[in-house]
A protein has these predicted regions:
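Short surface loop/edge beta-strand patches of beta-sandwich-type extracellular domains
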Residues: 1-12, 67-72, 122
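Extended recognition patches within non-cytosolic domains
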Residues: 1-11, 24-27, 99, 132-152
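A carbohydrate-recognition surface predominantly in extracellular/luminal proteins
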Residues: 8-22, 42, 77-79, 131-134
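Glycan-recognition/cleft segments
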Residues: 32-56
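Short, aromatic/His-centered strand-loop micro-motif at the edge of beta-sheets
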Residues: 57-80
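Short tryptophan-centered beta-strand motifs in secreted/extracellular beta-sheet-rich domains
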Residues: 76-94
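Short, solvent-exposed beta-strand-to-loop segments that form ligand-recognition rims
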Residues: 95-115
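Extracellular glycan-interaction patches encoded by glycine-rich segments
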Residues: 111-136
Length: 152
């Protein structure tokens, strides 16, 4: 883990990364916000599908659980991606564009997400890649802010 759990808001926020995979080798490479359990987690990852960025979101032991996917042109080149979470307002952003949404669901309870890891919550699926920037915002950003943040 890294940072301070005081900098993470479990009820709303944005996980932002400017990242590139070392290879498009069809393996999961994850960055996660979690609490060390399967109950509540946000996993931003290059998936086992070629050139695909995904988010797995799970809150309150599965009261809300979904996956958002988007195909990028090349995961070995730097991409700016962001995932916004807020009750009934979830979105994946990539290179200046909102690419996938989920419009219903609850978020984790306050002070639930406590760790930021370059792997899955259980220590698997290490992120093998390059990182220029990684940030967690304590509030859900507006569409205009996310456009600006993720534009290359």
């Amino acid at each position: 883990g890294a940072g301070s759990s005081d900098l993470i808001n479990s009820t709303e926020g944005v996980l932002y990364a400017e990242i590139a995979a070392l290879a498009d080798d069809l393996t999961n490479k994850q960055i996660s916000l979690n609490n060390g359990t399967t109950d509540d987690r946000i996993q931003l990852y290059y998936s086992a599908s070629s050139n695909q960025i995904s988010v797995f979101y799970k809150s309150q032991s599965g009261a809300t659980a979904f996956i958002l996917n988007h195909t990028l042109s090349d995961i070995t080149q730097f991409n700016k991606v962001g995932f916004k979470w807020k009750q009934n307002d979830f979105a994946l952003w990539s290179n200046g564009v909102e690419v996938a949404t989920q419009t219903s669901g609850v978020t984790s309870s306050a002070d639930t997400l406590t760790k930021l890891d370059f792997q899955q919550f259980n220590g698997s699926a290490d992120f093998y890649g390059k990182t220029k920037c990684l940030a967690v915002f304590k509030e859900a950003l507006t569409d205009a802010e996310l456009t600006c943040l993720t534009t290359t």
